[in-house]
Amino acid sequence: MGQKTFTEINNYRSGVIQENVVIFDTNILIDLFYPGNINRRSQQILNKLDDIYIDCLQQGKEIKIIIPIVSEFYNLAFKVALDNYNRNNGLRLKRKQFRKEPNFNIYNTGIISIIDNFSSQFKIEQYKFNYNNIVDKETKLLKLDFTDLIISTFCEEENACLVTLDKDFRKTFRRNLKFSIISNW
């Protein structure tokens, strides 16, 4: 295993990723595939993310995705659809109520189509996360949410480079990199 690096996204250049496996965190998938810039990123950041994605494809990197990331993507997209539906219709529906709305299927089908699109370009890994084998889970879970614990463990085990804009990864691993990270400072 080579040296692990932290690369600030603004300093990313083609060839920075030395690992063969790359993981795009949920927030990156949203920026790359979900319409409307819901994360309100600057055009400069969006262009960098596009560059990273294109470089990975051109360099033949194996882009993997695990089910917790797909789940986070669906849940976030669902929340955005619900919020937009409520705002546009002057409603205050909850998730279960929204599912019963006549237009729900349109939103749901759209979200599933986006997931199908990026899933067809990546390798969906059937990752068996073993919670009991995480020796420093108490420390990591002080800074990471549980899904991020799963993602970081996967990246470490797969020797993968994680592309994320979630500062929790930087804060948790900056002094003791277990895997390479491309993120914001």
Regions found by a protein language model. Name each.
Residues 145-153:
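Short amphipathic alpha-helical segments
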Residues 44, 142-143:
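Residues that cap or flank secondary-structure elements
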Residues 28, 69, 150-151, 168-169:
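Alpha-helix capping/helix-boundary segments
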Residues 24-27, 65-66, 143-146, 166, ...:
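Histidine- and aromatic-rich ligand-binding microenvironments
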Residues 1-17, 152-185:
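Acidic, PIN/NYN-like endoribonuclease modules and their adjacent C-terminal/linker elements
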